[in-house]
Regions:
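Bacterial N-terminal signal peptides that target proteins for export
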Residues: 2-12
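N-terminal targeting leaders of membrane proteins
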Residues: 14-17, 23-98, 102-109, 113-121, ...
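Outer-membrane beta-barrel proteins
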Residues: 114-120, 168-173, 213-224, 263-269
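Interfacial helix-loop-helix junctions of multi-pass membrane proteins
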Residues: 141-161
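Residues on the lipid-exposed face of transmembrane beta-strands in outer-membrane beta-barrel proteins
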Residues: 165-166, 209-215, 257-263, 298, ...
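Transmembrane beta-strands of outer-membrane beta-barrel proteins
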Residues: 179-181, 230-236
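Transmembrane beta-strands of outer-membrane beta-barrel pores
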Residues: 185-189, 238-242, 263-265
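Residues that define the transmembrane beta-barrel architecture of outer-membrane proteins
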Residues: 203-209, 249-257
Length: 324
């Protein structure tokens, strides 16, 4: 269990920082077919050293940020586990926390793979290193949580691994221009946090997570002219509302289907390039961030068995507030 907004913001910042590695020139050995099996030839000592340095820096950063941000003010007497479940109606945040871990793992692993490749690892080895490092970092976060009020949630660690593995699989299939995961914020009526100090955990009512089908990549594979459709994405998304403060009958778990704008494709069309110091972080940001009011569609509330829309996912009546 962790503060979802802080974690996903951290993943976005990490992605932008790691993206700077693209400006480092490095060798690119042949890419084996397998997603995770390393190349048959070991990297030279300099590449191994740099890979260890990058891995150590990431793990050290995880420990420092965890201590300064969460653990030092939320420690308990002993390590303990917590079974949070997955996406069920009675689970923590209605499962939004698990989807947050999935998307965060995807973002960090994808960018770490780029970083490892730029310092000389083969593409396959880079994906393997990124998947392992992202998963290990997730376990370290959960281990720290085990000594806090949150507890060690093995489901969070599995969700991190799933997101990291998904990133590796998509990249190995050379499908990054076709599918991807994003995180976004939507407006939602959230009461002021009076009485919140005694409780803990995130409110996910303003967060939305999407799996995107990018029409530009689809038409490219069909050898067809996409025309203006190349600027669109079809998305399936998930989000929960009210689990932090609303009575049970008001809480929602929404599965949505949207049509939205592909901001990366639009920016590229107007001349934004990864080769510039400002273009790369801008394109990276919109690769992983879903801008509000750029996607519209319908949502199905799993808790109440009803559809809502046409909208952005910002409709919610919190009812009588009672912070937990």
């Amino acid at each position: 269990m962790r503060r979802g907004l802080e974690r996903t913001k951290g993943a976005l910042v990490c992605a932008i920082l790691i993206a700077a590695a693209r400006f480092v020139r490095a060798a690119e050995p042949p890419d084996p077919v397998s997603v995770f099996v390393p190349a048959p030839v070991l990297p030279d000592p300099e590449v191994r050293k740099n890979s260890l340095l990058l891995s150590g820096a990431v793990l050290l950063a995880v420990l420092i940020v965890g201590e300064l941000t969460w653990w030092r003010s939320e420690t308990t007497e002993k390590f303990h586990m917590k079974n949070e479940g997955w996406l069920g109606q009675e689970t923590y945040a209605g499962g939004a926390d698990k989807v947050s871990h999935l998307v965060g793992g995807y973002i960090v692993s994808r960018e770490l793979a780029i970083g490892f490749e730029r310092i000389g690892n083969s593409p396959a080895r880079s994906r393997a290193l990124a998947t392992g490092l992202t998963s290990l970092a997730g376990v370290l976060v959960e281990a720290g949580d085990g000594f806090s009020v949150y507890g060690f949630a093995w489901e969070d660690a599995v969700a991190n691994l799933a997101g990291a593995s998904l990133a590796s699989a998509i990249t190995a299939a050379k499908a990054d221009d076709l599918v991807g995961l994003r995180y976004g914020l939507v407006h939602a009526k959230i009461p002021p946090p009076d009485g919140r100090a005694a409780a803990y955990g995130s409110d996910y009512s303003r967060e939305i997570y999407s799996l995107d089908l990018k029409l530009a990549g689809l038409f490219r594979r069909l050898n067809a002219d996409a025309g203006p459709a190349r600027f669109l994405v079809f998305s399936a998304n998930y989000g929960s509302k009210g689990y932090r403060f609303s009575p049970a009958e008001r809480r929602e778990r929404n599965v949505g289907f949207d049509v939205g704008l592909n901001m990366v494709e639009i920016l590229s069309a107007v001349g934004v390039r990864e080769s510039t110091w400002w273009g790369l972080p801008l394109l990276k940001f919109f690769t992983y961030y879903r801008l509000e009011f750029t996607a519209w569609g319908w949502r199905y509330d799993l808790n109440h068995g009803r559809w809502s829309g046409f909208g952005t996912g910002n409709r919610f009546d919190p009812g009588k507030v009672s912070y937990r």
